[in-house]
Amino acid sequence: MNLLLMGGTKDSVEIGKKLRDLGDLFILYTSTTDYGGKLGEEFANKVITKPLDKNELKEVIKKYNIDILVDATHPFAINASKNAIEVCKELNIKYVRFERKEEKINHPNIIYVKDFEEAARLAKKANKVFHMAGIKNLKMVVDIVGKDKVIARVLPISVSEALKILPQKQIVAMYGTFSKELNKYLIRDYNCDVIITKDSGESGGFKEKVYGALEAEAKVIVVERPKIDYPVCFDDIDELIKYIANLKI
């Protein structure tokens, strides 16, 4: 069986390793970054490191005779997931989604919003805002909140892009997920009274950001996940692997 694993996330690497252990499976792994692609080399027969539009995805599926597509992209990679669902339907192949569990936390100082524009408009009232939601929506947030009021934590690979938006002293370049304590100290050190984050789930360090902010006495604005009606969806990796193993029989 030939399987395409759309990844670039921590979860996708764990899924890939467990799929490899099933044996008798050709794994094609896709990631939008070189770093994500290197992680895929541990378990995949073939790695593609570039964003694929709908037509490119279709051609890749045809070229490698893919039987099943496992979408383990980030919960906010909505266009990639929509394209994958449509292409699988057109080509009549199985689409399976893995998505981290949502972690709704109820607290008077936590506000849930639908998108980053709403988040930025709410954050505009703050004295200083810590943007903990990656590079993609940083410019929009800065444009609305104000350049002098935003601190942004980004991946080291995104620093050059961030420097086009903010001065160096307002950029924190770090890789990984971080403890509640580290998040708390960063928020305090930069005197931020609001953070913007997104519901990225357990492996995205969501709880550690939220509780770190609350302990630093900062308000938390959380951008909710986009809602997609997935044909088949798992939030447990072992259950996903069992499902695919049964398809192989």
UniProtKB/Swiss-Prot annotation:
Functional summary from the UniProt entry: Catalyzes the reduction of the macrocycle of cobalt-precorrin-6A to cobalt-precorrin-6B.
UniProt keyword Oxidoreductase, yes or no: yes
UniProt-listed Pfam families: CbiJ
Catalytic activity from the UniProt record: Co-precorrin-6B + NAD(+) = Co-precorrin-6A + NADH + H(+)
Keywords for the protein's UniProt record, in alphabetical order: Cobalamin biosynthesis, NAD, Oxidoreductase
Family: Belongs to the precorrin-6x reductase family.
Name of the protein this chain belongs to: Cobalt-precorrin-6A reductase
Gene Ontology biological process terms, A to Z: cobalamin biosynthetic process
Alphabetized GO MF terms: precorrin-6A reductase activity
Superkingdom of the organism of origin: Archaea
Pathway(s) it belongs to: Cofactor biosynthesis; adenosylcobalamin biosynthesis; cob(II)yrinate a,c-diamide from sirohydrochlorin (anaerobic route): step 7/10
Keyword Lipid metabolism: no
Membrane-crossing segments per the record: none
EC number(s) per entry: 1.3.1.106
Source organism of this protein record: Methanocaldococcus jannaschii (strain ATCC 43067 / DSM 2661 / JAL-1 / JCM 10045 / NBRC 100440)
